[in-house]
A protein has these predicted regions:
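Charged, amphipathic alpha-helical segments
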Residues: 1-3, 48, 99
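A short, aromatic/hydrophobic, helix- or strand-capping loop or linear motif
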Residues: 21, 64-67, 105-112
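Helix-adjacent hinge/juxtasegments
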Residues: 50-76, 83
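Short beta-strand segments
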Residues: 12-46, 62-65
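A generic structural signal for nonpolar/aromatic side chains embedded in well-ordered alpha-helices
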Residues: 9, 54, 96-97
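Extreme N-terminal tail/first-helix region
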Residues: 1-15
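A short local loop/turn or secondary-structure capping micro-motif enriched for an aromatic residue
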Residues: 36-37, 49-52, 132-133
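Charged, gly/pro-rich active-site loop segments
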Residues: 73-135
């Protein structure tokens, strides 16, 4: 992973998760995201539309982008199959978020963590401003 891509992952707490509805239509929603070098994680209640979509079809796309336009648009795109984490894993990822921002938002108490492995960089598609990963 490039340092620029790592910086985008480290500096952005909100991204977009794209899933597929039962009728095949796309569903995109903003989520709170935290990452490490292996994966991106987000938190959602299991009753939300995107969480229900993941149970049915785990293939997702996650996008994070830099809002600092003075350096031009920069983004990270990760495609693959999401995993629903169990209670123990969710607790560990909540600790990762809490360490990053200094607290755990109260609405996260009922949230489940989801994981998408970052995987390999797609060098053919990636540019100097956008990095594409697939797992």
């Amino acid at each position: 992973m490039t340092e620029e891509a790592r910086t985008i992952l480290e500096n952005n707490l909100v991204g977009a998760v794209a899933t597929t509805n039962e009728d095949g239509s796309p569903w995109v929603t903003p989520v709170h995201i935290v990452s490490d070098d292996q994966a991106v994680y987000w938190f959602s209640k299991q009753t939300t539309q995107h969480s229900l979509n993941i149970v049915r079809n785990p293939r997702v796309s996650v996008t994070l982008f830099s809002s600092n336009l003075s350096k031009g648009p920069k983004g990270v795109y990760v495609n693959g199959s999401a995993q629903v984490l169990d209670v123990v894993e969710t607790t560990e990822i909540k600790k990762l978020l809490e360490a990053k921002i200094g607290f755990l938002p109260p609405n996260f108490n009922e949230a489940t963590a989801y994981k998408l492995k970052i995987g390999e960089i797609n060098r053919g598609k990636s540019t100097g401003n956008c990095w594409y990963f697939y797992s």
